[in-house]
Swiss-Prot record:
PANTHER family: FORMATE-DEPENDENT PHOSPHORIBOSYLGLYCINAMIDE FORMYLTRANSFERASE (PTHR43055:SF1). Its EC number is 6.3.1.21. This is Formate-dependent phosphoribosylglycinamide formyltransferase. Belongs to the PurK/PurT family. The gene is purT. The keyword Nucleotide-binding applies.
């Protein structure tokens, strides 16, 4: 039987968030709703989740010794990674010492690295994927591109939000693509994956929950990407019954192989009735922010409920809904927002993340909308997002 202690008391139940951005902030809010003590950690001060946590710490989470020292000092009941840039080998060590890593340390280690999860999916589980090669030098990169053929995509094996990714259509782009991949890796330069292009009708995120009462699926989420990052997402994405069945089977196999309780964002390509695996994150997914308006339990609530060992039961989807990012471009450490009075249309919501500064283009908020159709919901969400003026 689960016992939840009271925050800031001797028997408090403590959650340590490794990563304190907008997704971590929503996880922190769901923890707070259950009276859980939240410790927010990130590499910069005043990150969104830090603003609502009981305590916060600024460390380099790629420094295993610093991470270990902080965990030993705080003694959290649950260590919840919310980003990829973490010393995952140290998480494996901490788990062996008795600490609870969500969903488990091995899942975090494998999915931080595109090579680990791709080899698990394609070579161990036999899941359909794009053609791929790995390279760790410019020479082997060129050989990989030659083997895959044009056009192809290159990505650092460790990166997020499209950083370091390029579409290569000709040999003239190789130098630029290699250098960009080396700049975009989470842990600096290094190994890359070269992938062949996949013919698909659309991409989905299938939020998959592994909980004490089994595997649960949210309705498929469609999304539009630009510059490697999502701009709008919508739920439900319409797809054939056979494709949805195959997607759920694929997601279930991958999630069970990774292990541990929590919510996983499984990214898939869909072409007719065929489904091809792309990636998986063992945590809430940015495209899943639409669930803050589309479901009775958001992806963040589902994640917390699952890793605490609580049953999910069922997830109720309210109907056509969408999200659109608020993505300004400016330089400021004193950001201000205007226009909400006119931007907030009926059946819409706005989330401003509270990021302390902006240097260039940065996702600072999200607009949420519900409507009769997903197409209408997307257009309304985009209109709401465009109505928010960001200055500094």
């Amino acid at each position: 039987m689960l016992t939840i202690g009271t925050a800031l008391r001797a028997d408090a139940t403590r959650v340590m968030l490794l990563g304190s951005g907008e997704l971590g902030k929503e996880v922190a809010i769901e923890c707070q709703r259950l009276g859980i003590e939240v410790i927010a950690v990130d590499r910069y001060a005043d990150a969104p989740a830090m603003q609502i946590a009981h305590r916060s710490h600024v460390i380099n989470m790629l420094d295993g010794d610093a991470l270990k020292a902080l965990v030993e000092a705080e003694r959290p009941d649950y260590i919840v990674p919310e980003i990829e840039a973490i010393a995952t080998d140290m998480l494996v060590t901490l788990e062996k010492q008795g600490h609870h890593v969500v969903p488990c340390a091995e899942a975090t280690r494998l999915t931080m690295n595109r090579e680990g999860i791709r080899r698990l999916a394609a070579e161990t589980l036999g899941v359909p994927t794009s053609t791929y090669r790995f390279a760790d030098s410019e020479e082997s990169f060129r050989q990989a591109v030659e083997a895959i053929g044009y056009p192809c995509i290159v990505k650092p094996v460790m990166s997020s939000s499209g950083k370091g990714q390029s579409l290569i259509r000709s040999a003239e782009q190789l130098d630029k693509a290699w250098n960009y991949a080396q700049q975009g890796g989470r842990a600096g330069g290094g190994r890359v994956i070269v992938e062949g292009l996949v013919n698909f009708d659309f991409e989905i995120t299938l939020l998959t929950v592994h909980a004490v009462d089994g595997i649960h699926f949210c309705a498929p989420i469609g999304h539009r990407q630009e510059d490697g990052d999502y701009r709008e997402s919508w739920q439900p994405q319409q797809m054939s019954a056979l494709a949805q069945e195959r997607a759920q089977k694929m997601a279930s196999d991958v999630v069970k192989a990774l292990g541990g309780y929590g919510l996983f964002g499984v990214e898939l390509f869909v072409c007719g009735d065929e489904v091809i695996f792309s990636e998986v994150s063992p945590r809430p997914h940015d495209t899943g922010m639409v669930t803050m308006i589309s479901q009775d339990l958001s992806e963040f609530a589902l994640h917390v409920r699952a890793f605490l060992g609580l049953p999910i039961g069922a997830v109720r989807q309210y109907g056509a809904s969408a999200s659109a990012v608020i993505l300004p471009e400016l330089e400021s450490n004193n950001v201000r927002y205007q226009g909400l009075e006119s931007a907030l249309l009926p059946h819409t919501q706005i989330r401003l993340f509270g990021k302390p500064d902006i240097g260039g283009k940065r996702r600072m908020g999200v607009a949420l909308a519900s409507a009769e159709t997903t197409e209408d919901a997307v257009e309304i969400a985009k209109r709401v997002a465009a109505g928010v003026t960001v200055s500094g």
